Amino acid sequence: MNSGLKWRKLGRVFCPTGETPWMQSHAAVPIAEHLHDDLFRIYFSSRDARNRSYTGSLIIDIADPTRVLDLSTTPVLAPGSLGEFDDSGAMATWLTEVGGRRHLYYIGWNLGVTVPFRNSIGLALASVDGSDRFVRYAPGPIVDRSMTEPHFCASCCVVPNGDVFSMWYLACTGWQLCNGRPEHKYHIRYAESVDGVVWSRSGEVAIDFANIEEYAISRPSVMRDADVWRMWYSHRGRSYRIGYAESADGRRWTRNDNKVGIEVSEHGWDSEMIEYPFVFDHKGRRYMLYNGNGYGRTGLGIAILEGLT
């Protein structure tokens, strides 16, 4: 186990400026997909004028990551039909390969009445033409509220792990009224699947609240190195920061937020908060995509791991 990480910010990659009706603002919850050579496709969640979430994509060269080479003109994934679990938004949260086909896990949004929203996890499969388009696996979610998780589930990370797939996912533990407004509380739990579709959940907590002020832990990003599992995630009491944890088996985690090695900037687009990390490797280097102020309203950025401190 190391004494600490050190990330160097490379800059902001992209921030929407109303390019299309479905991309009026936000570039939240980024995901990197390696295409070939140094080219990567970055998936992200944008919003339209009605505040509905869409999934879009762009392409960068990792050698010059703050220059966008291509930007999608149509959504990768759009909100579902009226009354479905994702009719208010379809926000990509993780991409992995299952049985030779790319599986895109996404957060489906429904607006609520007694509480502002309800989330669940949906699945879309890659189009057979190899493009960035995805088609829904089913009109309903694959992970939703249940008898033992009655509120909502959201952002997740899915990793092949021997004969199963491991999922770390956001689970809401409850809502309460604060000054007359409903406020949620959620942390990260663990689930397993043999096919990446049907998931077994036991309520096992992976990352729990550090103190009574903390109320939100989200967007896990897990890497398995030779000697340790590592997880990056968002956590907040007052405003979002990126956290870090280590594990010997991917199940029992030790939080080491003080070792994360990345903080808000003194000024600019990520000076108030940093959140929604996505960590990936390329040619022996480790990178992190992340969001800044406004939960993705100011765009997405990239950092590179420079080593241990």
Provide a role label for each language-model segment.
Residues 1-25, 29, 33-88, 96-151, ...:
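Beta-rich carbohydrate-recognition and catalytic domains
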Residues 91:
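Metal-dependent C-N hydrolase catalytic cores
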